[in-house]
Amino acid sequence: MTQGAVKTLGKRSQAVSAKKQAILSAALETFSQFGIHGTRLEQVAEQAGVSKTNLLYYYPSKEALYIAVMQQILDIWLAPLKAFREELAPLVAIEEYIRLKLEVSRDYPQASRLFCLEMLQGAPLLQAELTGDLKQLVDDKSAIIAGWVASGKLAPVDPHHLIFMIWASTQHYADFAAQVEAVTGKTLQDEAFFQSTLENVQRMIIEGIRVR
């Protein structure tokens, strides 16, 4: 293959990747507003700036597109937990996990709300991912927390409930952003409010698991 052909192939691959990402971004916006049942592929195609035929070339059905969006969300959602490291001091590791989770709520609110909506519906299209990659990762990190508890580095706490508490307290600011803004007049986009939220959530959780 000539150098020119390689460059052409590379540009074509980049164009395809950009088009697929545009479709996924449009689908996220539409699904988060209307849900899978209220969304039409024509809406997504128009939002992405492609034809419906072109959309179906990459994602052959609405369900396939929805699953692709949810898998991308799950990758974003799991990234902070993957960064949870045993070699850090326990309280430092947990503080950092809280920070990363709150940043996800700030930076990807639509993704968080769509994920929440899927959970409320029983996650019919996401069971394989939840019982596979998600469960394995949570089990692995729970074992780290259990080890810290056993060695006296953390107060006695059930690892699963600690993780659930962190999820609940950080994702609330994305999933219930309208309520948070109605009560406080602020969102996580306000840097001072983000910092105050982070410090308060960290303090409430850390003080509950600190060894005394």
Where are the regions a protein language model picked out?
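Generic hydrophobic, amphipathic alpha-helix propensity
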Residues: 19-28, 44, 69-73, 77, ...
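Amphipathic alpha-helical segments used for helix-helix packing
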Residues: 106-128, 176-184
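Short alpha-helical scaffolding segments that buttress acidic/His motifs in well-ordered protein cores
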Residues: 98-101, 115-118, 166, 170, ...
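C-terminal peripheral helix-coil segments that are non-catalytic and often amphipathic
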Residues: 1-7, 103, 107, 135, ...
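All-alpha amphipathic helical-bundle segments outside canonical DNA-binding/catalytic cores
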Residues: 92, 128-133, 149-165
